[in-house]
């Protein structure tokens, strides 16, 4: 899984919308598995790269959760029996098993977000892009998101997530890309990226609180949990 972070206006959403042709480059090339993005329509690319909009209302348009789940797979020619099998699994995964016949706009804001996530996963793309999935989520929602990302990874899918929630980022992603003003400033393992204090300041990214405390205390190690902080603290105290 990969997280893309940076301040508002850094270009995060713009760049990921190029990954399945929602946007097209005005210069240069965007290659997906070596193929130019301009070689296919957005509809064709949706089989490869699924994009979950930040605002669910921009994505939902049918009269039931079930129909939202069925729509994409039908458009790409997925067999009906496979669609029905996937509905069972996806509905359970996103927590909407008992709400398949509800109108999406009768769902809570959190449930609507999971409805859009489910609709994209239904199409079985090789990569799934989440745009600010934690926005408006409670603790239970974040736990469910973590499980969704874990299962996607387990199934060999690439998960790319845009997020301002640094706690969620460090808990769930090993590779981090930092953007600022349309440029990639950092791209690497989470520990290395959050060790680049000055570059993070330039990109207006604030590390998780415990990480900031450790850096302020002069720790050379980059820590993300209280347990890791205390371990380093005790080791330093012992010296």
Question: Could you describe each region identified by the protein language model?
Answer:
Residues 28-36, 45:
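Conserved ABC transporter NBD signature motif
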Residues 81-99:
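Conserved ABC ATPase "signature" region
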Residues 103-107:
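Conserved ABC ATPase signature
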Residues 20:
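Helix-to-loop junction immediately C-terminal to a conserved catalytic motif
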Residues 181-182:
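Conserved ABC ATPase "signature" C-loop
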Residues 199-239:
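ABC ATPase nucleotide-binding domains
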Residues 163-164:
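H-loop/switch region of ABC-family ATPase nucleotide-binding domains
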């Amino acid at each position: 899984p990969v997280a893309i972070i940076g301040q508002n206006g850094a270009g995060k959403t713009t760049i990921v919308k190029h990954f399945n042709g929602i946007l097209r480059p005005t210069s240069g090339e965007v290659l997906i598995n070596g193929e130019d993005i301009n070689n296919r329509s957005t509809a064709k690319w949706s089989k490869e790269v699924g994009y979950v909009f930040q605002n669910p209302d921009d994505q939902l348009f049918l009269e039931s959760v079930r129909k939202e789940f069925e729509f994409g797979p039908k458009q790409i020619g997925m067999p009906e029996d496979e669609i029905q099998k996937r509905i069972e699994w996806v509905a359970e995964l996103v927590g909407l098993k008992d709400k398949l016949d509800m109108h999406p706009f009768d769902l809570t804001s959190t449930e609507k977000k999971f409805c859009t996530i489910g609709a994209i996963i239904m199409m079985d793309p090789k990569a799934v892009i989440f745009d600010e999935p934690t926005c408006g989520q409670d603790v239970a929602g974040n736990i469910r998101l973590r499980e969704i990302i874990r299962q996607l990874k387990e199934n060999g899918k690439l998960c790319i997530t845009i997020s301002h929630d640094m706690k969620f980022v460090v808990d769930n992603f090993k590779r981090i890309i930092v953007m600022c003003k349309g440029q990639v400033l950092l791209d690497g393992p989470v520990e290395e990226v959050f060790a680049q204090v000055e570059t993070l300041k330039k990109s207006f990214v604030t590390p998780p609180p415990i990480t900031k405390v450790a850096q302020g205390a002069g720790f050379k190690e980059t820590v993300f949990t209280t347990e890791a902080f205390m371990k380093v603290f005790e080791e330093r105290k012992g010296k």
